[in-house]
Amino acid sequence: MLNYALLMVLHLIGDFYLQSDKVARCKNARVGEKCNSCTECKKGSYLNVKYVLIHSLIYVIPFLLLVLITDVKTLALVILILAVSHAIVDAIACWANKKTKVTVVFLIDQAIHSVVLYLIFRYAGLNGIPDAYAAAVKVAFVVLLLMAPCSILVNKLMEDTFPESVSLGLFDVGSIIGILERVLVVVFAYLGELAAIAIIITVKTWARTADLQDKEFRNRYLLGTLASLVSAVLVFMLYKLI
């Protein structure tokens, strides 16, 4: 499973950390104040093909590292499969975002990408990763997953539940607090200090006592906190499976 974890690490880098806000917005044809209003993004458009293709090409860049554990011919085939499948899945996701809940689309989108990577793991004949790198791959997988992907998932859940809410960027204060919260939850879960997790939630809640008097804020706070906690627990469970 270590090779699969490596594929997931490369996927996370390509899909979340090499994708700029502009590409993410433009591939979904979201015309706004920060948009130059490309001719492809007319009113009612579902996607911008140019940016879907740009993202798909950038996405496969991290996978070039697989040359260390496979031959060039196999690598070329893997890169081609990943680029084409990613473009197709993302194009469908862009269309679906206009039709249904973005949280559902996001989860299905990532599930499909994960299945494609698993098939590559099973049938591409990749060489094994030396045990010396096992810990680094596992830690990278957990850290990368706890940051951007979990933050985006929470943001999309908030967007679906509270349509008027403003999405937070990865490095906004709220997102940073959420990231630190998830990291601490995973660390304490790894150490078996479950009581410390309760303390984190207690301190966080105490710090927002005044704001919690507002019903709307209270609902947002509870949903965001619970979603963040659940995602952290799921990441820890995935770590244990690697």
Where are these regions (language model features)?
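Interhelical loop and helix-boundary elements at the membrane-water interface
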Residues: 16-56, 89-188, 207-231
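Short hydrophobic alpha-helical segments that form membrane-spanning helices or hydrophobic packing faces
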Residues: 22-23, 62, 120, 199-203
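Alpha-helical transmembrane segments
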Residues: 1-9, 74-81, 134-147
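Transmembrane helix-loop-helix
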Residues: 63-85
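Short, aromatic-rich membrane-interface segments at the entry and exit
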Residues: 72-79, 131, 195-199
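Alpha-helical transmembrane segments and their membrane-interface junctions
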Residues: 187-204
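Juxtamembrane boundary at the C-terminal end of a transmembrane helix
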Residues: 233-242
